[in-house]
């Protein structure tokens, strides 16, 4: 019997989920199953068919299935969760947390039933708390439940730095710690352009402005769109994580991981530098932090814990 292709299921066929499915197929990383609720089964099938019809033009071989039936996800190597509601005007953060937690728990039960050996990558906001909810519901080891925010936040930081210096984004590296949101901690000391520390290339006031813009990166796009939120960069970030796992690349990526004493915190999911490979979370990298960075990280932890208090 010939070797079968890897299988990736994406739960939630909105803009981010559908774009993640397309990028994953386009890179020939795996066959893809795109899942949404029964009421949206036809649009989900339509998106999958549309992607499939792009394959002869783009020149990729991958099977893409749209469905509302979790049986179709059986035996997935990776399951990406983008399902959930966005915060609407007048909705409290607690309402958002409660609603999305219920969605996470029901989705996770289906994932565990049909793909008990998979690795789960969570994107749904508030992502630190939602990843924790999935971890608890799944009963999986922490290595197999991770969240995405740091790859995206770092990508935004790198984009703004490259614009500032008029350089290729490929030559800019960076790292963002902490929760996803206003309390994220971009580690400027560990950020470089062509191996040269950013602090030697960009004046402090400009660097501070870039850090602040990174923190507000999601909001900037929401304001410009007027309706909806970012999806190209979030989907590209998810795809980078999927590729690192399927190809066992052992990439150093900022990932939302479960802490057990690292950075002085435990029992919480938080964005930290990690090594991502075939087992999912291969290792958490502990960096030496300054007192200021530690204080910033603690503030970030408190924000995440405040959201987690709402979890059942």
Curated annotation (Swiss-Prot):
Enzyme class: oxidoreductase
Keyword set, alphabetical order: NAD, Oxidoreductase, Phosphoprotein, Tricarboxylic acid cycle
Domain of life, source organism: Bacteria
EC number(s) per entry: 1.1.1.37
Modified residues (Phosphoserine): 149
Catalytic residues, chain numbering: 180
Any Pfam family hit: Ldh_1_C
SUPFAM superfamilies for the chain: LDH C-terminal domain-like, NAD(P)-binding Rossmann-fold domains
Keyword Transmembrane annotated: no
GO BP, sorted A to Z: lactate metabolic process; tricarboxylic acid cycle
Binding of NAD(+), residues: 12-17, 36, 100, 123-125
MF (Gene Ontology): L-lactate dehydrogenase activity; L-malate dehydrogenase (NAD+) activity
Ligand binding (substrate): 87, 93, 125, 156
InterPro entries assigned: L-lactate/malate_DH, Lactate/malate_DH_C, Lactate/malate_DH_N, Lactate_DH/Glyco_Ohase_4_C, Malate_DH_type3, NAD(P)-bd_dom_sf
Catalytic activity: (S)-malate + NAD(+) = oxaloacetate + NADH + H(+)
Family, similarity comment: Belongs to the LDH/MDH superfamily. MDH type 3 family.
Cross-referenced PANTHER family: L-2-HYDROXYCARBOXYLATE DEHYDROGENASE (NAD(P)(+)), L-LACTATE DEHYDROGENASE
Primary role: Catalyzes the reversible oxidation of malate to oxaloacetate.
Listed name of the protein: Malate dehydrogenase
Species in which this protein is naturally found: Bacillus velezensis (strain DSM 23117 / BGSC 10A6 / LMG 26770 / FZB42)
